[in-house]
């Protein structure tokens, strides 16, 4: 395997895929990225066996096709510290030989692990398919993920519950998260193709990785899922994840119905007031008391 690519192009792709690699791995191959050079380009893959990220890298000149693995964190840090305008050459003759990286007057060698040891996270059939705009996906995540539980014993709360339902006579795609103390719920119009989807719990790590990738995307994001796995396609990047195997609680039972105590406040002014008052709290939970009067709201 031998190819040449602009440092900026390679760095961007490495940043996307190496992010899923766990820093402390008991399985050595999971600390590596799979590099596959072939006619037409380069493909990078990283996985922790729960999530897999695959990216097709453009603008690569392939002199010799081949496959190898390389330590994700080391490769990323080397490329990150190269000059912005550098051309990066990666050369691996095959077998157990080391991977050579060259850029201008700099060169180094990296140990590799056998390609056959790199795990494949087979997707199986993903029968339910639909698309969301990048803005819709960002909103579903941003307005719910703060409520995801971090308590590992309640594993079924360690993600966002996504399902198709009805609200006010309209069909919607709803995202819900709760940690048992707070609950966040947000809806988008139901995309075409999502009507028959099962309710699924997308894990917290997947949500965080997906949100980072969605920040760079403006086009539609394709979603494909089964009751055990979900795949998001964001341009040249594919993120595939296992789903949490559990039953999300009947959250609607804890939402008050017919509540006539409704208050509307200016969002920015309220957020700024909460931040100022919470700043002087010494308690870990940083509580803020709301005193509500006629046409007034006092925070203390």
PLM segments and residue spans:
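Structural preference for solvent-exposed beta-strand-turn elements
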Residues: 1-300
């Amino acid at each position: 395997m031998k190819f040449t690519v602009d440092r900026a192009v390679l760095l961007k792709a490495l940043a996307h895929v190496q992010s899923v690699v766990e820093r402390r791995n008991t399985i050595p191959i999971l600390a590596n990225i799979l590099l596959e050079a072939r006619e037409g380009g380069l493909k990078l893959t990283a996985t922790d066996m729960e999530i897999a990220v695959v990216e097709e890298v453009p603008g690569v000149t392939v002199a010799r096709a081949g496959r190898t693995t390389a330590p994700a964190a080391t490769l990323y840090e080397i490329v990150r510290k190269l000059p912005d305008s550098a051309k990066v050459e990666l050369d691996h003759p095959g077998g157990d030989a080391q991977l050579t990286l060259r850029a201008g007057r700099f060169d180094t060698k990296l140990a590799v692990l056998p390609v056959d040891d790199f795990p494949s996270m087979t997707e199986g059939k993903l029968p339910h398919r639909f698309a969301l705009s990048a803005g819709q996906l960002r909103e579903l995540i941003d307005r719910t993920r703060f409520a995801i539980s971090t308590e590992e014993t309640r594993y079924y709360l360690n993600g966002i519950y996504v399902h198709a339902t009805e609200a006010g006579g309209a069909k919607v795609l709803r995202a819900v998260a709760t940690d048992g103390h707070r609950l966040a719920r947000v809806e988008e119009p139901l995309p075409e193709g999502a009507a028959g989807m099962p309710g699924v719990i997308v894990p917290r790590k997947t949500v965080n990785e997906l949100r980072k990738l969605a920040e760079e995307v403006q086009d539609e994001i394709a979603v494909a899922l089964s009751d055990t796995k979900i795949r998001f396609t964001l341009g040249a990047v594919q993120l595939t994840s296992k789903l949490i195997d559990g039953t999300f609680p009947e959250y609607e039972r804890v939402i008050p119905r017919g509540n006539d105590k409704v208050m509307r406040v200016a969002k920015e002014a309220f957020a700024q007031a909460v931040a100022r008052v919470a700043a002087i709290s010494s308690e870990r939970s940083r509580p803020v008391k709301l005193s509500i009067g006629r046409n007034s709201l006092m925070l203390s």
